[in-house]
């Protein structure tokens, strides 16, 4: 069979069925991601003055870290100062 015939026949066939079951919706993916995080980490919700939030975001940007990573480093640093 020539390549042109092969190309025509392969593209005209039905698409292969998804083999791993039904794909998850974006909401389901997000829910599973949060569940995995909750298994290992504790959630902290805080309200900051806008100037402190801007400082936090600046630190994150400069260091290339997430907010969680910056806050963890700050807490560790303060804990060492206090001998906790």
Curated annotation (Swiss-Prot):
Keywords for this protein: DNA-binding, Plasmid, Plasmid copy control, Repressor, Transcription, Transcription regulation
Polar residues bias (residue ranges): 1-13
An annotated GO BP: plasmid maintenance
Entries under InterPro entries matching the protein: RepA2
GO molecular function, one term: DNA binding
Signal peptide positions (record): none
Residue numbers spanned by region Disordered: 1-31
Function: This protein is involved in the determination of copy number in gene replication. It binds to the repA promoter thus inhibiting the synthesis of the mRNA for the initiator protein repA.
NCBIfam families: PRK13702.1 (NF010256)
Name recorded for this polypeptide: Replication regulatory protein repA2
Source species of the chain: Escherichia coli O157:H7
Name of the encoding gene: repA2
